[in-house]
Every structure is written in C-alpha cells, then in structure tokens.
Amino acid sequence: MNKVVLLCRPGFEKECAAEITDKAGQREIFGFARVKENAGYVIYECYQPDDGDKLIRELPFSSLIFARQWFVVGELLQHLPPEDRITPIVDMLQGVVEKGGELRVEVADTNESKELLKFCRKFTVPLRAALRDAGVLANYETPKRPVVHVFFIAPGCCYTGYSYSNNNSPFYMGIPRLKFPAEAPSRSTLKLEEAFHVFIPADEWDERLANGMWAVDLGACPGGWTYQLVKRNMWVYSVDNGPMAQSLMDTGQVTWLREDGFKFRPTRSNISWMVCDMVEKPAKVAALMAQWLVNGWCRETIFNLKLPMKKRYEEVSHNLAYIQAQLDEHGINAQIQARQLYHDREEVTVHVRRIWAAVGGRRDER
C-alpha cells in the first residue's frame, strides 16, 4: 500500500497536494500527488512500497493545514458486482489490517457524492459484520486500534485502507457534526466551536475553556465568536466599531469597546483567550497576533487568515513562519497549529498556545 488519500475542501486540492508533497519530502518520503479539480480529495502516491504507512505513522496529522482526514490505501477496486460488493473489499483488506477498532465507509464532501453517502450508511452494517468475521475488525469498537476506511469515489468503485487512531481525525469524513445554535448572532460561531473541537483535546476543555476566564474578541460584531466564549461563562471584551447583538449584552458578561481591533491594547494582565475573525490581509493579521503573543497579552489565541486567490499554501506558510520567528526571537515557547476547517471558506484557522513558565517571575508570565 503506497498511496495516501487526503480528504480536503473541494477547490483546495492543489493546496492540499502542495502541502503533502512539501511535508512528505521534508521527511524524505518521496512521491507525486494525483489531483482532480473539485474532487474533494488528493492521492499522494509514494515511490517506495511501504512509504504510505510510514507517512501516516510519522508525519503528525495535526501539522497538516488543508487535509481533513487521511488514510493509506491500495489499488482502486473497480466494477464491484452489485450482487456481492462485500467479498472483494474483505479480500483486499485481509492481511493488511488485523482487528481494526472502527469502520468508516466514506465519500468526498461534494454534491455529486451525496447520493453515494446514503448507500455508504446502509452498506456499513453488513460490511462491518463481514469484516469482523474475517478478523479485519475486532468484535467491538475501540479507539486503540487502527481505523478501517472504505472510500467510494463512484458507485461500485472504492479505495480500501486504514489510518492510525492516534494520528488521524476522530471525525467521520474529517468533519465534526455541529448544530447551529438558534440564539447565536451569526453562523460564524460554528468556526470557533469547530476550532475548539479540532485544536483542544476534549479532556482539557474544563481547564483551558474554564468558567470565569477573561477573553478578548477582536472584530467581534455582531458577536458570533463572542457567543462561544459567553456560552462557556467567560468574561469578554468585544472590540469592534460595529454594534454587538443585544442578546449578548443582556448576559452581563460582555463589555463592548467601540475601537479598532488593530489599535486596541488590553489593560488587564490575566487574559486567557484572544480570538479574531477580521477581514484583512493575512500578513497584517499575523503581525497583530505576533504582537499579542510576544507581549504576553493572552495565553492562547484562535484567529482566521483570509486566503489570496493564488499561492494559498505559500501565503499561509509564510505567515505562520513569521509568527514562529517572532516568538523565537523573544525566547517564547509556543505550539502553533493551523487547519482549514469545515466551516471555513477562503480562509484557514490558526491556534497558538504559549507554553507558560513553571517558575514565577519569568518575563513570559507578565
């Protein structure tokens, strides 16, 4: 199995391909990407037979920006007989995976695949039973074993393979299923909620998204992102010349500051979170975020970088490298992650967490 399938947002296949080619090459795993425009997936074909497994084992999935999910696969199965689609799939997976922990029968996130998705859901139950009988799947679901993927690209036409549960997306098709809260002021609220799911482990939410924290929302109007912070019982400074939703102001947790987000400077020294979703050039936003982090004005930040029409991967990489360089220059240790979320459009969402000193009095504990 020398191919890796990467699911992505339709229209961003070139960026996904450029990224995996770059990051696989850095680890001396060489190959080439097969790209079909608006297909919603990319296939990276490695030159060496075992390099597909090596890639999904060694390259951290969290380091990828444009991939929603990935898994290693073998050759394409075509012309599956309608009377028995199961046997060829079982035969393909036997000897490749033993006692997998979960089965996901998936498609790309395109309009053309929606009809196929209905079939996948029905097909999952009998296929799971057959894979358990064959020993490909364990008799019970477990997150400690590899995930078995069956990826349909057309009726009767699929790739089969696996991913490692400690280095993949935990979500079906790489998409968290979130429901829009009726009381939220705008649909952008789902971007921040998804970012929390993607960037912050579930067992750390109570500590890192805690009641009573102080937060700042730059470019807050009408309050889609502020809503997520208020929902978690934080106190929020919402910075924007535009008005905030009255429902948020009525909570008593929001202080509306009619200022330009680029000029605002916090007066508190205990701000845990700064979030920012402003329509501005990515370099300008990156510079502002670096300033907040270098000065210790917040512990963690989630922000969006709007993408240009061309060279999107290069632009994002350049801005992330700039932030990293600023942090390095000032001796600040931090974790940086970026992802094009399901609820993002022409943008990527970035999370930066300062690793604060254990010893009091350090300059990064101001």
Swiss-Prot record:
It comes from the Bacteria. It catalyses: cytidine(2498) in 23S rRNA + S-adenosyl-L-methionine = 2'-O-methylcytidine(2498) in 23S rRNA + S-adenosyl-L-homocysteine + H(+). Pfam families: FtsJ (PF01728), RlmM_FDX (PF18125), RLMM_N (PF21239). Belongs to the class I-like SAM-binding methyltransferase superfamily. RNA methyltransferase RlmE family. RlmM subfamily. It comes from Shigella sonnei (strain Ss046). It is found in: Cytoplasm. Its EC number is 2.1.1.186. Monomer. The keyword Glycosyltransferase does not apply. The gene is rlmM. Catalyzes the 2'-O-methylation at nucleotide C2498 in 23S rRNA. S-adenosyl-L-methionine binds at S188, C221, P222, G223, G224, D240, D260, D277. HAMAP family: 23SrRNA_methyltr_M. InterPro entries: RlmM_FDX, RlmM_THUMP-like, RNA_MeTrfase_FtsJ_dom, rRNA_MeTrfase_M, SAM-dependent_MTases_sf. GO terms for cellular component: cytoplasm. GO terms for molecular function: S-adenosylmethionine-dependent methyltransferase activity. Disulfide bonds: none annotated. One of its GO terms (biological process) is methylation. It is an enzyme of class 2 (transferase). The active site is at K306 (proton acceptor). This is Ribosomal RNA large subunit methyltransferase M. SUPFAM superfamilies: S-adenosyl-L-methionine-dependent methyltransferases (SSF53335). Keywords: Cytoplasm, Methyltransferase, rRNA processing, S-adenosyl-L-methionine, Transferase.
